[in-house]
A protein has these predicted regions:
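Eukaryotic phosphoinositide-binding membrane-targeting regions
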Residues: 1-93
Length: 93
């Protein structure tokens, strides 16, 4: 069954999609720093990230300084477990 999942990579990329396994989001050469699940809060215009990956664990936000987010999410807030990612700078690609 497909689920809305995300991972973050050592290079800072947020990889997001609807997949079977978190590893399906990784590209060759990516090193995963954890992952979880996502949903869009349309009322608050926010990308809500939560949970953890059973393969890679909880996202290790402290290991990145800049989160590279797909351009299609520009203008949306980004929260993990209901908290803003204040310590991480967000850039779009």
């Amino acid at each position: 069954m497909l689920h809305p999942k995300f991972v973050i990579t050592r290079a800072g990329y947020l990889r997001i999609g609807t997949v079977h396994m978190h590893r399906d989001l990784l590209q060759p050469g990516d090193r995963c720093l954890g992952g979880g699940y996502w949903e869009i809060d349309y009322v608050d215009n926010c990308l809500e990230l939560s949970g953890l990956s059973y393969d890679y664990g909880e996202p290790r936000w402290c290991e990145i300084t800049t989160l590279l987010v797909p351009q299609s999410y520009r203008g949306m807030g980004i929260r993990y477990e209901g908290k803003e990612l204040a310590t991480v700078r967000v850039r779009y690609y």
